[in-house]
Amino acid sequence: SGSLLGMCLIVRIITGLFLAAHYTADTSLAFNSVAHTCRNVQFGWLIRNLHANGASLFFICIYLHIGRGLYYGSYLNKETWNIGVILLLALMATAFVGYVLPWGQMSFWGATVITNLFSAIPYIGQTLVEWAWGGFSVDNPTLTRFFALHFLLPFVIAGLTLVHLTFLHETGSNNPLGIPSDCDKIPFHPYYSTKDVLGFALLLTPLIALALFSPNLLGDPENFTPANPLATPPHIKPEWYFLFAYAILRSIPNKLGGVLALAASVLVLFLIPLLHNSKLRSMTFRPLSQILFWALVANLLVLTWVGS
């Protein structure tokens, strides 16, 4: 699944570059520039749909990748694991700032709600939020800096990915039995290269199907309305890949408590290597751990469902 994440990143950087060429980061022009891209730019509609739906595929892959790492004890490669968690955080940040750029209703209010969470931090919270906004509300300065961040972060992710791989190559990767596999090593080409290309094909097929047949299936219809600071949408909610975290945030009736729970739900991944307490590395022969693992997966699915 790592190679799929790499391909997601490459596809999104390429489509993103083409989109950035036609995008204008200004509150009065952003919404119209996206509409212009879809209507007047050659294949602009396709580039935008691939870019927008590629995020969903990226998150599916990264969640599968994390689940696989948890199941097989890959987190015992501590450096690789920790950089992986940082990569997840960077991806979540990138997706968030990117969602704001079309400057529709959900873009604007999503940005307002999530940036506002920083005000829950004691003492420095309010200052921090106004500093992040560049004013007293989400406005033009916020949009321009979010565009800058959305352009920068994917390249940071690409750089971190190289570090992630470098650390992985120190030890070599793990396998389902959790035992050394030196005797089973085979040439990368044609074996792994073929396996990766098959993965690419299997990933690109649903992406292209989604982009061509139902590009707006996963989006929020609210975002077809240009941002209006005076009208709050009836239901503010994030894209599906953040729903589990949003459900945790909203289930706690205290601002700071919700923020801490939200942060903890992702940052807990940093603790996993410290919590490993078994003589066996992977869960292949540990039925109790398997039950807990699949309970965790079920929990995340239920949270995603409840959050919507």
Swiss-Prot record:
Residues reported in the UniProt entry to bind a ubiquinone: 169
GO molecular function per UniProt: metal ion binding; ubiquinol-cytochrome-c reductase activity
Binding site for heme b b562: 51, 150
Tagged with keyword Metal-binding: yes
Bilayer disposition of the protein: Multi-pass membrane protein
Cofactor note: Binds 2 heme b groups non-covalently.
Residues that hold heme b b566 according to the record: 65, 164
GO cellular component: mitochondrial inner membrane
InterPro entries, per database record: Cyt_b/b6_C, Cyt_b/b6_C_sf, Cyt_b/b6_N, Cytb/b6-like_sf, Cytochrome_b_C_euk/bac, Cytochrome_b_N_euk/bac, Di-haem_cyt_TM
Record flagged with keyword Transcription: no
A biological process from GO: mitochondrial electron transport, ubiquinol to cytochrome c
Family stated for the protein in its record: Belongs to the cytochrome b family.
Name of the featured protein: Cytochrome b
